UniProtKB/Swiss-Prot annotation:
HAMAP family the record matches: Ribosomal_uS7_B
One Gene Ontology CC term in the entry: small ribosomal subunit
Pfam family, one: Ribosomal_S7
Designated name of the protein: Small ribosomal subunit protein uS7
CDD domains hit by this protein: uS7_Bacteria (cd14869)
GO term, biological process aspect, one: translation
Length: 156
C-alpha cells in the first residue's frame, strides 16, 4: 500500500461556453486519446440538438438528467466468516457525479443512432424524462441495495 496518502484532487476549470464544471467533466469523460477538441464538438452539437428539440436550456436538461442518473445507494462486497455479502452503502457526492457521468457516456455509446452527438443528446433527453438505459442502471443499483438491506449492519 502506498505511504504517501491519496493524490490531491485537481480543480476542474468551468467550461468556457456554458461556464459549468459539470459540463467540463462530461467533456473529459467523452474524450478519447486526449482529443479534447473532438469531445467538446460532440458535446456542443449534442446540446444544440437538445435545444432544438426541447426548446429549453440544454444545461438545465443536462442537470435534470444527472439528478435522475446519480445513485444514492450502491452495494459493496464484504467478506464475513468465509462468505461474501453485498453490503449496501451510501454513495459519496463526488462518486455519485462520477458514476452518473460514466453511465451516461457508456450507455450513450451503446445506442443505435448514427452519430455520437445524436446518441448523447437522446440519452440526456431520455434521462431527463426518467427513461433510458442510464436511469435503468441507477434503478438496478438501487434494487440491489434494497434487496441486500438485511446486510446493512455489516457496514464499515
Amino acid at each position: 500500500m502506498p505511504r504517501k496518502g491519496p493524490a490531491p484532487k485537481r480543480e476542474v476549470l468551468p467550461d468556457p461556453i456554458y461556464n459549468s464544471k459539470l459540463v467540463t467533466r462530461l467533456i473529459n469523460r467523452l474524450m478519447l486519446d486526449g482529443k479534447r477538441g473532438k469531445a467538446s464538438k460532440i458535446l456542443y452539437n449534442a446540446f444544440d440538438i437538445i435545444e432544438k428539440e426541447t426548446g429549453s436550456e440544454p444545461t438545465g436538461v443536462f442537470e435534470e438528467a444527472m439528478n435522475n442518473i446519480m445513485p444514492v445507494l450502491e452495494v459493496k462486497a464484504r467478506r464475513v466468516g468465509g462468505s461474501n455479502y453485498q453490503v449496501p452503502i451510501e454513495v459519496r457526492p463526488d462518486r455519485r457525479t462520477t458514476l452518473g457521468l460514466r453511465w451516461l457516456v457508456n450507455y450513450a455509446r451503446l445506442r443505435g443512432e448514427h452519430t455520437m452527438p445524436e446518441r448523447l443528446a437522446r440519452e440526456i433527453m431520455d434521462a431527463a424524462n426518467n427513461t433510458g438505459a442510464s436511469v435503468k442502471k441507477r434503478e438496478d443499483t438501487h434494487k440491489m441495495a434494497e434487496a441486500n438491506r438485511a446486510f446493512a449492519h455489516y457496514r464499515w
